[in-house]
Every structure is written in structure tokens, then in C-alpha cells.
């Protein structure tokens, strides 16, 4: 199966919406939405990756 990914090129953003569309990171943490996840990816210098869509 192809690896799942999200495009984080527009991030980081100073604020994220409260929209709840959970994604599961490679750190086994559930992020509330793509914005929160992508901000964390940038903060991790790209070491954090997407595990799957939905809660961990």
C-alpha cells in the first residue's frame, strides 16, 4: 500500500482552527487536524510523519 502523507508546505501557521479531523502521527499521538499535525511536523524538523488518518 502507498504511504499516506499530507502536504505541509504551507505550514507552520500561527493559529489552527478547532476543526476536528484527527490524524495519527508516527509518535503515536492523535492530532486534532492537519494544521496541528503540520505545525508539529515543522517543529520536529521533519522527523514526525503521518501514521494514518483518524485517531491513533
Curated annotation (Swiss-Prot):
Gene3D superfamilies cross-referenced by the UniProt entry? 3.30.60.30
Q: Which GO terms describe its cellular component?
A: extracellular region
Coiled-coil positions? none
Covalent S-S links between cysteines: 8-38, 16-35, 24-56
Q: Which domain of life is it from?
A: Eukaryota
List the subcellular locations: Secreted
User: Domain Kazal-like, which positions?
Assistant: 6-56
Q: Does the keyword Glycoprotein apply?
A: yes
**GO MF annotation, one:** serine-type endopeptidase inhibitor activity
Task: Keywords in alphabetical order, please.
Answer: Disulfide bond, Glycoprotein, Protease inhibitor, Repeat, Secreted, Serine protease inhibitor
Q: Please give the Pfam families that the UniProt record associates with this protein.
A: Kazal_1
Q: Taking the first listed entry, what is the main subcellular location of this protein, grouped into a coarse class?
A: secreted
> Where do the record's glycosylation annotations fall on this chain?
45
Q: Does the keyword Glycoprotein apply?
A: yes
Q: Please state the span of the N-terminal signal peptide per the UniProt entry.
A: none
Residues the record annotates as the site (Reactive bond 3) are 18-19
Domain note for this entry? Answer: Avian ovomucoid consists of three homologous, tandem Kazal family inhibitory domains.
Name of this protein: Ovomucoid
Q: Which organism is it from?
A: Pternistis erckelii
Amino acid at each position: 500500500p502507498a504511504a499516506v502523507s499530507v502536504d505541509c508546505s504551507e505550514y507552520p501557521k500561527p493559529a489552527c482552527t478547532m476543526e476536528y479531523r484527527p490524524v495519527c502521527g508516527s509518535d503515536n499521538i492523535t492530532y486534532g487536524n492537519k494544521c496541528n499535525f503540520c505545525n508539529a511536523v515543522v517543529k520536529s524538523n521533519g522527523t514526525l510523519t503521518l501514521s494514518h488518518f483518524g485517531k491513533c
